[in-house]
From Swiss-Prot:
It comes from Sorghum bicolor (Sorghum). The gene is CYP99A1. The keyword Transmembrane does not apply. Its EC number is 1.14.-.-. It is found in: Membrane. Heme binds at C453. This is Cytochrome P450 CYP99A1. Its cofactor is heme. Keywords: Heme, Iron, Membrane, Metal-binding, Monooxygenase, Oxidoreductase. GO terms for molecular function: heme binding; iron ion binding; monooxygenase activity; oxidoreductase activity, acting on paired donors, with incorporation or reduction of molecular oxygen. PROSITE patterns: CYTOCHROME_P450. InterPro entries: Cyt_P450, Cyt_P450_CS, Cyt_P450_E_grp-I, Cyt_P450_sf. Its main location: membrane.
Length: 519
């Protein structure tokens, strides 16, 4: 897609950036660039977050790039991130237009990509009050309990109790743990959002959105060459996914409406969807609380995609790091088993506050592998100063959260998986102080400011219980005699950062229980 865009760009136009008239401040420094395509060659890699970190080390924490026809500024230091995400939050609170959001998210009618304004404020307030606040998350404890126990049963089944994991000759049972945690995450999010389990059909649309949601489609880089995405078939693929999504949601909405008519009252069994249908008003104005059927679809996809992709990817990365660090695995398992032994499964989530080291493991996993390494892009709404440089109106602003969390200036041994860095007795007060609220800008896996991910409490509750139960019920080993240092850690980056290949592991039960008999 990038090659096609470049060829047509060379044949069609010459784009030059004109300096702001009367500007006394200088543009941020940046690397060399070519006519027409600007700095795109610097990002011709499967690891754009790494390439941007390396460029920032040469050119500074506030760096200018010309991406095709788009001006972009990359933020790579906590001080600059604070300026953008907190000090001048409203200036950078909107999103640039992206092809994926225009098509799959119904013209950016969701919460993540909606333009900053009254409609976005209404959507955020609605999602927080009805699904994502701490009280609502606690109420969903039974859902998390049920689905994470189902995950344990699926591991058993996949490993050999009917799932074919153990071969005819008694080979070690290998399970695709990545696929299983993805299914668990989708089940939790689906039941919370729709009141029912979701099938893989929605995940197929999520995969399309993640793959093309990075903002590097031809039309996103060369707005005047929007037709390139038509010629290459990308627009058709996105519309095919959108029609598939419409069919899925039309069926789900019809089922929910039928139940409501039959019961003649809200029962709470339809999850967040039931609330949205109650306040639906296809003729109302969004700013006054009216919400259309189309907007409901966009919000639902936002919740399903965000809640599923982030939690499952994080769980898979955390388990990967633990497999590479056996001493951390042993320490976390000892803590989990000490806290959960003798407790009924229904009491497991109530013991999470005792799992301080396991929570450090989760925090460290999110430091090394933020699911959104470049967060979601922002758009500068008025010309302003960042780090002593001018950022002009309309500039796309990219915050490299991955680089912030691996800065050697802020972190000791930043490339090492070391959960102990967050302990009170580790001697690193800066690391101990970090949390998930986005107030320490060297650690912002969920972003910061007005556009911070509102689902962090929801996602963390599911993630921590999922990891704790995987550590409690099973011992894990690598297949085929693989050594920890040989584990594949390759990534693929679209709008999120996934493992290139799902994690495959060999489980063995910690103790024989009604859940783990069969391996």
């Amino acid at each position: 897609r990038l090659i096609s865009a470049v060829i047509l760009a060379v044949c069609s136009l010459i784009s030059r950036r004109k300096p702001s008239p009367g500007s006394k401040k200088k543009r941020p420094p940046g690397p060399w660039r070519l006519p027409l395509i600007g700095n795109l060659l610097h990002l011709a890699t499967s690891q754009p977050h790494v390439a941007l970190r390396d460029l920032a080390m040469k050119h500074g924490p506030v760096m200018y790039l010309r991406l095709g026809q788009v001006d972009a500024v990359v933020i790579s230091s906590p001080a600059a991130a604070q300026e953008v995400l907190r000090d001048k939050d409203t200036t950078f609170a909107s999103r640039p237009s992206l092809l994926v959001a225009d098509i799959i998210l119904y013209g950016s009618m969701d919460m993540s990509f909606a333009p900053y304004g009254g409609n976005w404020r209404m959507l955020r307030k609605l999602c927080m009050s009805e699904l994502l606040n701490t009280h609502k998350v606690r109420q969903l404890a039974a859902v998390r309990d049920s689905e994470t126990l189902s995950l344990v049963r699926k591991v058993v089944y996949a490993a050999g109790a009917g799932g074919g994991g153990r071969g005819q000759r008694g080979e070690a049972p290998v399970v695709n743990l990545g696929r299983l945690v993805l299914s668990c995450s989708m089940a939790i999010t689906g039941r919370a959002t729709l009141g029912k389990l979701c099938g893989d059909e929605i995940m197929s649309v999520v995969d399309v959105a993640v793959l093309y949601g990075s903002g590097f489609c031809a039309g996103d880089l060369f707005p005047s060459l929007w037709f390139v995405d038509v010629v290459t078939g990308l627009t058709r693929r996105l519309w095919t996914a959108r029609r598939r999504l419409d069919a899925i949601f039309d069926r789900i909405l019809a089922e929910c409406e039928a139940r409501q008519r039959q019961e003649e009252k809200m029962t709470g069994d339809d999850g967040f969807l039931g609330v949205l249908l109650r306040i639906r008003d296809d003729d109302g104005e969004p700013e006054t609380g009216g919400i259309s059927t189309t907007s409901i679809k966009a919000i639902l996809f936002d919740m399903l995609a965000g809640g599923t992709e982030t939690t499952s990817s994080a769980a898979e990365w955390i388990m990967s790091e633990l497999m590479r660090k056996p001493e951390a695995m042993a320490k976390a398992q000892a803590e989990v088993r000490g806290a959960l032994d003798g407790k009924s499964p229904e009491d497991h989530e109530g013991q999470m506050d005792k799992l301080s080291y396991t929570r450090m493991v989760v925090k460290e996993g999110l430091r090394l592998h933020p699911v959104l390494p470049l967060l979601l892009p922002r758009s500068c709404q008025e010309t302003c100063d960042v780090g002593g440089f001018e950022v002009t109106k309309g500039t796309k602003v990219i915050v490299n959260a991955w680089a912030l969390a691996r800065s050697p200036e802020r972190w000791h041994d930043p490339e090492e998986f070391r959960p102990e860095r967050f302990a009170d007795d580790d001697g690193s007060s800066a690391a101990v102080a970090v949390d998930y609220r986005g107030s320490q800008f060297e650690y912002i896996p969920f972003g910061s400011g007005r556009r911070m991910c509102p689902g962090n409490t929801f996602g963390l509750a599911a993630l921590e219980l999922m990891v704790a139960r995987l550590l409690y019920y099973f011992d894990w080993s690598l297949p085929d005699g693989m050594r920890p240092e040989e584990l594949d850690m390759d990534t693929v980056v679209g709008s999120t950062m996934r493992r290139r290949n799902h994690l495959h592991l060999v489980p063995s039960p910690y103790k024989e229980t009604e859940l783990t008999v069969g391996i």
